[in-house]
Protein backbone atom coordinates (compact mmCIF):
# COMPACT_ATOMS: atom_id res chain seq x y z
CA UNK A 1 0.00 0.00 0.00
CA UNK A 2 1.44 3.35 -1.02
CA UNK A 3 1.87 6.11 1.58
CA UNK A 4 -0.92 8.11 -0.08
CA UNK A 5 -3.31 5.16 0.00
CA UNK A 6 -2.32 4.34 3.58
CA UNK A 7 -2.97 7.95 4.58
CA UNK A 8 -6.40 7.82 2.94
CA UNK A 9 -7.15 4.52 4.71
CA UNK A 10 -6.29 5.94 8.14
CA UNK A 11 -8.22 9.13 7.49
CA UNK A 12 -11.31 7.21 6.37
CA UNK A 13 -11.24 4.69 9.21
CA UNK A 14 -10.56 7.16 12.02
CA UNK A 15 -13.14 9.68 10.85
CA UNK A 16 -15.74 6.96 10.41
CA UNK A 17 -14.95 5.46 13.83
CA UNK A 18 -15.12 8.80 15.64
CA UNK A 19 -18.25 10.30 14.06
CA UNK A 20 -21.70 9.77 15.57
CA UNK A 21 -23.37 6.50 14.79
CA UNK A 22 -25.45 3.93 16.64
CA UNK A 23 -22.48 2.44 18.53
CA UNK A 24 -20.94 5.72 19.61
CA UNK A 25 -24.25 7.20 20.69
CA UNK A 26 -25.14 4.05 22.64
CA UNK A 27 -21.67 4.05 24.29
CA UNK A 28 -22.06 7.71 25.30
CA UNK A 29 -25.58 7.17 26.61
CA UNK A 30 -24.66 4.06 28.59
CA UNK A 31 -21.58 5.61 30.22
CA UNK A 32 -23.47 8.81 31.02
CA UNK A 33 -26.32 6.93 32.66
CA UNK A 34 -24.47 4.04 34.29
CA UNK A 35 -20.80 5.03 34.41
CA UNK A 36 -17.91 3.58 32.45
CA UNK A 37 -17.46 0.46 34.59
CA UNK A 38 -21.13 -0.54 34.32
CA UNK A 39 -20.96 0.00 30.55
CA UNK A 40 -18.13 -2.44 29.90
CA UNK A 41 -20.62 -5.22 29.02
CA UNK A 42 -22.18 -2.93 26.42
CA UNK A 43 -18.74 -2.12 25.00
CA UNK A 44 -17.70 -5.78 25.04
CA UNK A 45 -20.85 -6.81 23.17
CA UNK A 46 -20.23 -4.09 20.60
CA UNK A 47 -16.59 -5.10 20.19
CA UNK A 48 -17.25 -8.81 19.68
CA UNK A 49 -20.14 -8.13 17.32
CA UNK A 50 -18.05 -5.55 15.45
CA UNK A 51 -15.24 -8.07 14.95
CA UNK A 52 -17.60 -10.73 13.64
CA UNK A 53 -19.28 -8.26 11.29
CA UNK A 54 -15.89 -7.11 9.96
CA UNK A 55 -14.94 -10.73 9.28
CA UNK A 56 -18.28 -11.25 7.52
CA UNK A 57 -17.64 -8.08 5.49
CA UNK A 58 -14.29 -9.55 4.52
CA UNK A 59 -16.00 -12.72 3.33
CA UNK A 60 -18.61 -10.78 1.40
CA UNK A 61 -16.07 -8.41 -0.13
CA UNK A 62 -13.75 -11.27 -1.01
CA UNK A 63 -16.43 -13.60 -2.39
CA UNK A 64 -18.72 -11.25 -4.25
CA UNK A 65 -17.81 -8.75 -6.92
CA UNK A 66 -21.16 -7.06 -6.58
CA UNK A 67 -23.41 -7.28 -3.53
CA UNK A 68 -27.06 -8.12 -4.30
CA UNK A 69 -28.89 -4.77 -4.05
CA UNK A 70 -32.03 -6.46 -2.67
CA UNK A 71 -30.07 -7.88 0.27
CA UNK A 72 -28.46 -4.52 1.00
CA UNK A 73 -31.87 -2.83 0.82
CA UNK A 74 -33.41 -5.36 3.23
CA UNK A 75 -30.48 -4.97 5.60
CA UNK A 76 -30.89 -1.20 5.44
CA UNK A 77 -34.52 -1.43 6.53
CA UNK A 78 -33.68 -3.85 9.35
CA UNK A 79 -30.87 -1.58 10.50
CA UNK A 80 -33.06 1.51 10.39
CA UNK A 81 -35.78 -0.24 12.40
CA UNK A 82 -33.29 -1.33 15.07
CA UNK A 83 -31.76 2.14 15.27
CA UNK A 84 -35.21 3.72 15.68
CA UNK A 85 -35.94 1.18 18.45
CA UNK A 86 -32.69 2.18 20.17
CA UNK A 87 -33.66 5.85 19.82
CA UNK A 88 -37.00 5.13 21.48
CA UNK A 89 -35.27 3.20 24.31
CA UNK A 90 -32.87 6.09 24.94
CA UNK A 91 -35.54 8.81 24.67
CA UNK A 92 -37.86 7.04 27.11
CA UNK A 93 -35.23 5.70 29.49
CA UNK A 94 -35.37 7.02 33.04
CA UNK A 95 -32.65 9.43 34.09
CA UNK A 96 -31.04 9.83 37.48
CA UNK A 97 -33.29 12.88 37.86
CA UNK A 98 -36.28 10.53 37.70
CA UNK A 99 -34.89 8.65 40.69
CA UNK A 100 -35.21 5.28 38.94
CA UNK A 101 -32.38 2.81 38.76
CA UNK A 102 -31.95 1.07 35.43
CA UNK A 103 -29.48 -1.45 34.10
CA UNK A 104 -27.33 -0.84 31.05
CA UNK A 105 -28.36 -2.51 27.81
CA UNK A 106 -27.19 -6.13 27.81
CA UNK A 107 -24.09 -7.61 26.22
CA UNK A 108 -26.28 -9.52 23.76
CA UNK A 109 -28.39 -6.51 22.77
CA UNK A 110 -25.28 -4.45 21.97
CA UNK A 111 -23.81 -7.51 20.21
CA UNK A 112 -26.96 -7.90 18.08
CA UNK A 113 -26.89 -4.23 17.09
CA UNK A 114 -23.76 -4.86 15.07
CA UNK A 115 -25.51 -7.17 12.62
CA UNK A 116 -28.00 -4.50 11.58
CA UNK A 117 -25.68 -1.51 11.99
CA UNK A 118 -25.45 -0.34 8.40
CA UNK A 119 -22.75 2.21 9.27
CA UNK A 120 -20.22 -0.45 10.29
CA UNK A 121 -21.21 -2.81 7.47
CA UNK A 122 -20.60 -0.06 4.92
CA UNK A 123 -17.44 0.92 6.82
CA UNK A 124 -16.09 -2.63 6.51
CA UNK A 125 -17.11 -3.27 2.92
CA UNK A 126 -15.87 0.17 1.80
CA UNK A 127 -12.51 -0.09 3.57
CA UNK A 128 -11.85 -3.60 2.33
CA UNK A 129 -13.03 -3.12 -1.25
CA UNK A 130 -11.40 0.30 -1.64
CA UNK A 131 -8.10 -0.01 0.20
CA UNK A 132 -7.27 -3.71 0.54
CA UNK A 133 -8.68 -5.82 -2.30
CA UNK A 134 -7.20 -3.67 -5.08
CA UNK A 135 -3.77 -4.23 -3.47
CA UNK A 136 -3.99 -7.88 -2.45
CA UNK A 137 -6.39 -10.80 -2.29
CA UNK A 138 -4.27 -12.59 0.32
CA UNK A 139 -6.66 -13.94 2.94
CA UNK A 140 -4.21 -13.18 5.76
CA UNK A 141 -4.20 -9.48 4.82
CA UNK A 142 -7.97 -9.34 4.46
CA UNK A 143 -8.52 -10.97 7.86
CA UNK A 144 -5.79 -8.83 9.45
CA UNK A 145 -7.32 -5.60 8.16
CA UNK A 146 -10.76 -6.78 9.32
CA UNK A 147 -9.40 -7.23 12.84
CA UNK A 148 -7.74 -3.79 12.59
CA UNK A 149 -11.05 -2.23 11.49
CA UNK A 150 -12.78 -3.76 14.52
CA UNK A 151 -10.05 -2.41 16.81
CA UNK A 152 -10.39 1.09 15.33
CA UNK A 153 -14.17 0.92 15.76
CA UNK A 154 -13.79 -0.22 19.36
CA UNK A 155 -11.42 2.69 19.97
CA UNK A 156 -14.14 5.09 18.77
CA UNK A 157 -16.73 3.45 21.03
CA UNK A 158 -14.45 3.66 24.06
CA UNK A 159 -13.70 7.34 23.35
CA UNK A 160 -17.41 8.14 23.28
CA UNK A 161 -18.01 6.11 26.46
CA UNK A 162 -15.16 7.95 28.20
CA UNK A 163 -16.70 11.27 27.12
CA UNK A 164 -19.98 10.13 28.65
CA UNK A 165 -18.18 9.17 31.84
CA UNK A 166 -16.07 12.34 32.07
CA UNK A 167 -19.04 14.63 31.50
CA UNK A 168 -21.39 12.45 33.52
CA UNK A 169 -22.25 15.12 36.07
CA UNK A 170 -23.14 17.66 33.38
CA UNK A 171 -24.98 15.08 31.31
CA UNK A 172 -26.88 13.80 34.34
CA UNK A 173 -28.00 17.33 35.20
CA UNK A 174 -29.51 17.56 31.74
CA UNK A 175 -30.29 13.85 31.37
CA UNK A 176 -33.72 14.15 29.78
CA UNK A 177 -32.50 16.72 27.26
CA UNK A 178 -29.41 14.64 26.46
CA UNK A 179 -31.53 11.51 25.94
CA UNK A 180 -33.78 13.41 23.53
CA UNK A 181 -30.78 14.80 21.60
CA UNK A 182 -29.15 11.35 21.42
CA UNK A 183 -32.44 9.80 20.29
CA UNK A 184 -32.79 12.45 17.58
CA UNK A 185 -29.21 11.76 16.44
CA UNK A 186 -30.09 8.07 16.16
CA UNK A 187 -33.21 8.91 14.15
CA UNK A 188 -30.96 11.03 11.92
CA UNK A 189 -28.64 8.01 11.51
CA UNK A 190 -31.63 5.86 10.52
CA UNK A 191 -32.83 8.44 7.96
CA UNK A 192 -29.30 8.86 6.53
CA UNK A 193 -29.29 5.16 5.64
CA UNK A 194 -31.71 5.97 2.83
CA UNK A 195 -30.65 9.51 1.84
From Swiss-Prot:
One matching Pfam family: LysE
GO MF annotation terms: amino acid transmembrane transporter activity
Keywords: Amino-acid transport, Cell inner membrane, Cell membrane, Membrane, Transmembrane, Transmembrane helix, Transport
InterPro entries for the chain: LeuE-type
Major place of residence: membrane
Topological domain ranges for the Cytoplasmic compartment: 29-46, 91-104, 163-176
Periplasmic side: 1-7, 68-69, 126-141, 195
Transmembrane stretches, start-end: 8-28, 47-67, 70-90, 105-125, 142-162, 177-194
Membrane topology: Multi-pass membrane protein
GO biological process, one term: cysteine export across plasma membrane
Subcellular location: Cell inner membrane
GO cellular component terms attached to this protein's record: plasma membrane
Reaction(s) catalysed (UniProt annotation): O-acetyl-L-serine(in) = O-acetyl-L-serine(out); L-cysteine(in) = L-cysteine(out)
Similarity remark: Belongs to the Rht family.
Cited function: Exporter of O-acetylserine (OAS) and cysteine.
Record's protein name: Cysteine/O-acetylserine efflux protein
Species lineage: Bacteria, Pseudomonadati, Pseudomonadota, Gammaproteobacteria, Enterobacterales
